[in-house]
């Protein structure tokens, strides 16, 4: 096989599931699809597992396939230069405060899109005296119980954090720039029952078809709703008939969870 090296800035494998340990952290794609096709796990405890179980799964894969011998932990790549003459890459990294330069033939970037937390530029933020942290840097100690807490943003992480901490806070306020759509998913907090686990483990090809069933509705099945119909009359908030039906489905699912009319206007997107 090919010789390869993995440069990992953290001191352990797991990637996003190593870094994101905030309350309520869990996957938002069904486990039986959000996993390696060559390393199926038929014993997930939940359809959308929480961070500890996901980290355990990826760590076991890391050990089983003997990836550690190819990995340099606590090593951050700071510069890449391509040499046109010999068609190779110069990789500059930092490990234990030392700069290391190496030549390689191929570079594959797997840094992800969300590995560098970005704080909003808020006037006066430097004078704030309370605890302030990004969701990916959630402290180990409890710093929110009985406190007034502000959550900036209402995206995927906020969907998970807010319900998990609301009852512990003295007061919880969400600051939102624009509302996002929330996909209705009745199985989001459900356990995988024993019957499903048995079928996945024992019925030939069932796990493969089940994986496809989880994949298709969130991909190719949605294509018709993504094309702009030039003759569609409701162009202010939808782009075709299928898209409008999906918007209505999402809207009704959100309305079913909200009873405050003033809040409804704040959480239903206008796009």
How should these model regions be labeled?
Residues 2-125, 141, 154, 159, ...:
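N-terminal FAD-binding dinucleotide-binding subdomain shared by FAD-dependent oxidases/monooxygenases
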Residues 103-105, 130, 146:
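Active-site acidic short loop of glycosyltransferases
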Residues 126-134:
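Extended hydrophobic/aromatic segments used for targeting, binding, or gating
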Residues 133-146:
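A short, basic/flexible loop-to-alpha-helix module at the beginning of a structural domain
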Residues 146-147, 170:
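Short coil/turn connectors at secondary-structure junctions
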Residues 147-155:
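Beta1/beta-strand and adjacent pyrophosphate-binding region of the FAD-binding site
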């Amino acid at each position: 096989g090919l010789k390869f090296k993995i440069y990992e800035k953290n001191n352990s494998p797991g990637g996003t599931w190593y870094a994101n340990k905030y309350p309520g952290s869990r996957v938002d794609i069904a486990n039986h699809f959000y996993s390696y096709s060559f390393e199926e796990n038929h014993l997930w405890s939940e359809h959308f597992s929480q961070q500890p179980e996901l980290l355990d799964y990826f760590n076991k894969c890391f050990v089983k396939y003997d990836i550690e011998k190819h990995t340099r932990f606590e090593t951050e790549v700071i510069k890449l230069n391509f040499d046109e003459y010999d068609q190779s890459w110069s990789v500059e990294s930092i490990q234990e405060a030392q700069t290391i330069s190496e030549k390689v033939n191929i570079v594959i970037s797997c840094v992800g899109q969300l590995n560098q937390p970005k704080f909003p530029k808020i006037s006066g933020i430097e004078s704030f005296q309370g605890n302030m942290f990004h969701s990916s840097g959630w402290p180990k100690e409890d710093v929110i119980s009985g406190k007034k807490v502000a959550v900036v943003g209402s995206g995927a992480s906020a969907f998970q954090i807010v319900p998990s901490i609301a009852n512990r806070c003295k007061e919880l306020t969400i600051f939102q720039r624009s509302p996002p759509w929330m996909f209705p998913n009745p199985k989001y907090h459900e356990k995988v029952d024993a019957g499903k686990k048995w079928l996945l483990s024992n019925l030939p090809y069932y796990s493969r078809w089940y994986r496809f069933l989880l994949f298709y509705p969130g991909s190719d099945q949605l294509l018709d709703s993504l094309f702009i119909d030039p003759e569609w009359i409701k162009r202010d908030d939808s782009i075709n008939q299928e898209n409008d039906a999906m918007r209505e489905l999402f809207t009704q699912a959100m309305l079913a969870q909200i009873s405050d009319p003033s809040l409804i206007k704040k959480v239903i997107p206008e796009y």
